[in-house]
């Protein structure tokens, strides 16, 4: 069947954005060309009228609570409280992102401090990139990397500090929990 959306044109669309410095915002601004070059610098041209949220959860809650709101989150953060928009007729699905028909996507990167040699951090990265780690990634709605192999880490003792985007926090917490179960020496 066909769907018809009736919008009360007397209500403005509420634009909801992430905070300046957010990786999700940076990717959105870049992917949609919401930046201009000023004096050789790329400048984020997100409207000053946007409601600014400071994490993914607040973005979802804000958009879900306002029928006229529009915002953005990563596919893995998407839940039933909001509806993903089609881009050029393509739905936001893992398959469409992988085949290139849904053109709005970005990779998540793992970064470590240059020159750092933390055995636990290195082993944790090995776990994340393993078949077991990428299964957790996929099970949580994110797109796994291809060509993985079984975890064969060294299981060193010690600790590592993990931080980053709120877009990745839920899956990262599950990866940490799973890693600690295969490497009880890690703190």
Language model segments and positions:
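Exported/periplasmic ABC-transporter solute-binding proteins
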Residues: 2-3, 7-187
């Amino acid at each position: 069947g066909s769907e018809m959306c009736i919008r009360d044109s007397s209500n403005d669309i509420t634009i909801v954005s992430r905070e300046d410095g957010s990786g999700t915002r940076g990717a959105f601004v870049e992917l949609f060309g919401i930046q201009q070059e000023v004096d050789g610098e790329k400048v984020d041209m997100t409207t000053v009228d946007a409601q600014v949220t400071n994490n993914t959860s607040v973005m979802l809650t804000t958009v879900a609570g306002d029928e006229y709101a529009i915002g953005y989150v990563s596919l893995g953060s998407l839940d039933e409280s909001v509806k993903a928009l089609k881009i050029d007729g393509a739905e936001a699905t893992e398959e469409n992102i992988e085949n290139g028909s849904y053109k709005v996507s970005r990779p998540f990167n793992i970064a470590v401090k240059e020159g750092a040699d933390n055995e636990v951090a290195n082993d944790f990265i090995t776990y994340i990139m393993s078949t077991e780690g990428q299964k957790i990634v996929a099970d949580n709605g994110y797109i796994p990397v291809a060509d993985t192999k079984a975890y064969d880490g060294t299981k060193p003792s010690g600790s590592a500090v993990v931080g980053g985007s709120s877009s990745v926090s839920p899956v990262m917490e599950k990866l940490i929990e799973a890693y600690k179960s295969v490497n009880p020496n890690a703190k």
